[in-house]
């Protein structure tokens, strides 16, 4: 038994001492640090880069390596890597020492507005407004100080440029640039187009109003070549001279120098503008019939209004607000409506002037006097019939008057029956749905609007109002 216990203890001692002899210790402290560093997962990045570069150098130049290099120990390789790493670290430190002052210098120069080369061109008042002040902003979407414009300012600026340059391509260029940069979407581009079109119409109306105000003021247009005092030319005199002496006198068109694009488009004094109105037969016939000096002012106003409306329709067609067919239809209605309204307005004066052309001379016989009176009465009757016709003033006035009256009575009778049916069948319904007082006010407003547009005569409108007021 004692022998067995002694043998078991010897076996335990052998097992405990075996693992210690199986794993030898490192020979030196340097090998131990290298061993620990290789086992570590957090090696410095610089060492990894240097080691990779050293491997590349060895692979690229295998023939230049000496036979003794294969006998180098890991300690020599580590020293080589350390030398390369230290060299790279020193170079990076030198670059970092040099770079901060340079960066600071650039920042100081950027912040210093006096060193900006673009300021000379920006504040040069001799340059045109189309020479854009920012190289990265060729469409001029910045203010003078460089701050971005608001949405309303951009819309107004685009509309102004389209009006000044008379070119739709300006809008397309700006929108395509904004779309390419991703600043707006397709829907926003359509919205912007509507807003620009609205702003352009307001701008045209504003310029037209300003131009009409300047027509009332006499202005000195030119100066004689001999150095004389400039002549005062009023718009009325210019129109009269241009219409009566178009073949012989060309000084009027030469003296009327226009300053902006709107005046070039709406100037009634030019000969070619007056000839353009020949394409509107009703209006042109009305103009040629106005010859008296008292109606010269009326004639000038009519030409200005008609030219402004024609150019406005052209602009709407050009920029896609309305179709060309709608523009032609609108111009045809415009020609007929303005001519008819003006003729009705001047009817009283025209009748008086015509009646004065047929007085009863004292030296004529009684029969001749009676025939003259009959002719004058006929003319008054014909001109009076124009009040009852709003559709066609070139056809037989008597027949058209009867037809217009019959249509009016039938129309009024239909209104009367419609209202009676509403009163009869709406006893249980909501009274507010067919409130006659509200309907009466609405009909009165519509009738007045139709009178202003020339759709109804004043007598027809009054008849409609009486029917609704009697219910």
UniProtKB/Swiss-Prot annotation:
- Per UniProt, which keywords does this protein have? Cleavage on pair of basic residues, Cytoplasmic vesicle, Glycoprotein, Membrane, Phosphoprotein, Proteoglycan, Secreted, Signal
Q: How does it sit in the membrane?
A: Peripheral membrane protein
Cellular component GO terms held in the UniProt record = extracellular region; secretory granule membrane; transport vesicle membrane
Q: List residues modified as Phosphoserine.
A: 40, 365
Here the segments flagged for biased composition (Basic and acidic residues) are: 28-45, 345-355, 364-404
| Residues carrying a glycan | 40
Any one Gene Ontology biological process term?
Answer: protein localization to secretory granule
Question: Major location, coarse class?
Answer: cytoplasm
Q: What does UniProt give as the signal peptide span?
A: 1-22
* Expressed in which tissues: Expressed in various brain areas, with highest levels in the arcuate nucleus and the lateral hypothalamic area, as well as the paraventricular nucleus and the ventromedial hypothalamus (at protein level).
Q: Where is this region: Disordered?
A: 24-45, 89-108, 345-404
| Localization of this protein | Cytoplasmic vesicle, Secretory vesicle; Cytoplasmic vesicle, Secretory vesicle membrane; Secreted
Entries under PANTHER family matching the protein: SECRETOGRANIN III, SECRETOGRANIN-3
Kindly state the subunit structure of this protein.
Interacts with CHGA. Interacts with secretogranin II/SCG2. Interacts (via C-terminus) with CPE.
Q: What does this protein do?
A: Member of the granin protein family that regulates the biogenesis of secretory granules. Acts as a sorting receptor for intragranular proteins including chromogranin A/CHGA. May also play a role in angiogenesis. Promotes endothelial proliferation, migration and tube formation through MEK/ERK signaling pathway.
What protein am I looking at? Secretogranin-3
């Amino acid at each position: 038994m004692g022998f067995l216990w002694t043998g078991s203890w010897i076996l335990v001692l052998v097992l405990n001492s075996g693992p210690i002899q199986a794993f030898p210790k490192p020979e030196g402290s340097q090998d131990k640090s290298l061993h620990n560093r290789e086992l570590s997962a957090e090696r410095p990045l610089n060492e990894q880069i240097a080691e990779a570069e050293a491997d590349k150098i060895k692979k690229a130049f295998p023939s230049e390596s000496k036979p003794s290099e294969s006998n180098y120990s890991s300690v020599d390789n580590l020293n080589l890597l350390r030398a390369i790493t230290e060299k790279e670290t020193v170079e990076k430190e030198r670059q970092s020492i040099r770079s901060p002052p340079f960066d600071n210098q650039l920042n100081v120069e950027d912040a210093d507005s006096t060193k900006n080369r673009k300021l000379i061109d920006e504040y040069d008042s001799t340059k045109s407004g189309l020479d854009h002040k920012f190289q990265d902003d060729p469409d001029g979407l910045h203010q003078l100080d460089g701050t971005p414009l608001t949405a309303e300012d951009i819309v107004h600026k685009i509309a102004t440029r389209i009006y000044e340059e008379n070119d739709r391509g300006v809008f397309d260029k700006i929108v395509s640039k904004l779309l390419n940069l991703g600043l707006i979407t397709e829907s926003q581009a359509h919205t912007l187009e509507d807003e620009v079109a609205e702003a352009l119409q307001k701008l045209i109306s504003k310029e037209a109003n300003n131009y009409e105000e300047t027509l009332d003021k006499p202005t000195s247009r030119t100066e004689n070549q001999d150095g004389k005092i400039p002549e005062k030319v009023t718009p009325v005199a210019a129109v009269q001279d241009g219409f009566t002496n178009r073949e012989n006198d060309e000084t009027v068109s030469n003296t009327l120098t226009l300053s902006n694009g709107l005046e070039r488009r709406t100037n009634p004094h030019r000969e070619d503008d007056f000839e353009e109105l020949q394409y509107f037969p009703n209006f042109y016939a009305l103009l040629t019939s106005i010859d008296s000096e008292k109606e010269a002012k009326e004639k000038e106003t009519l030409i200005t209004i008609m030219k402004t409306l024609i150019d406005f329709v052209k602009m709407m067609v050009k920029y896609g607000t309305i179709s060309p067919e709608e523009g032609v239809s609108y111009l045809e209605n415009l020609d007929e409506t303005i001519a008819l309204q003006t003729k009705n307005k001047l009817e009283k004066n025209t009748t008086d002037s015509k009646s004065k052309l047929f007085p009863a001379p004292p030296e004529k016989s009684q029969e001749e006097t009676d025939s003259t009176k009959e002719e004058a009465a006929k003319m008054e009757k014909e001109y009076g019939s124009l009040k009852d016709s709003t559709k066609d003033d070139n056809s037989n006035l008597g027949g058209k008057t009867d037809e217009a009256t019959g249509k009016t009575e039938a129309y009024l009778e239909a209104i009367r029956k419609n209202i009676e049916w509403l009163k009869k069948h709406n006893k249980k319904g909501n009274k507010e749905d067919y409130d006659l007082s509200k309907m009466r006010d609405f009909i009165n407003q519509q009738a007045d609007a139709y009178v202003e547009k020339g759709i109804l005569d004043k007598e027809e409108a009054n008849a409609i109002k009486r029917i609704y007021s009697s219910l």
